[in-house]
Amino acid sequence: MPEDRKPPAQIRQFDHREFGVPRLLEHKESTLVSVCLPARNEGLTVGPIVATLRTELLLTGVVDEILVIDDHSTDNTAAVAREAGARVVSAADILPEYGGGFGKGEVLWKSLYVAEGDVIVWCDADISQFGSRFVSGILGPLLCESDVDLAKGFYRRPERDREGGGRVTELVARPLLSLFCPELAELHQPLSGEYGGKRAVLEQL
């Protein structure tokens, strides 16, 4: 191995079935957990997602906050999310002194400013077959494994999307990571919208 080649990153793999509610609560203790949903014109899907998170994770005590960051939606995203039980914040109202940009990247860094959690999990707001496992599978390693600071989800796509999904990941993202950051080559879906981390680490990135 060339001397300038970085050592492999410590990437570990977990399964959401390892992290049921009892185990998550056992390790959570006083840790505050926020789930953040960046959303733009997701009025059709954000409601069921928030409702599921509220019933299965918020009311059970695993999650302390469900936060929807509304990115200049022109539909009823904000109203639907609020009615389902989320705290809704407009991206335009967060740190306006730094400019009012658009897009997911803008929402992600701003959400770190308004989220209350010590651990923050982000999840896409357009998932049509959502289950709380999308969040608990990411949250589990962050709560139960002391040496895990960042977690990123991957999953099998629905059969109907097999031919049309994941092309950017397989043809662009993963080859580029393998070329320029080979220590991250093991990431299955580097562009997936489900990931999380500990605030102490995220604020340094």
Language-model-detected regions and their locations in the chain:
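A conserved acidic beta->alpha catalytic loop
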Residues: D70-A79
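The conserved acidic donor/metal-binding loop of glycosyltransferases
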Residues: D124-F130
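N-proximal low-complexity "stem/linker" segments adjacent to membrane-targeting elements
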Residues: M1-T52
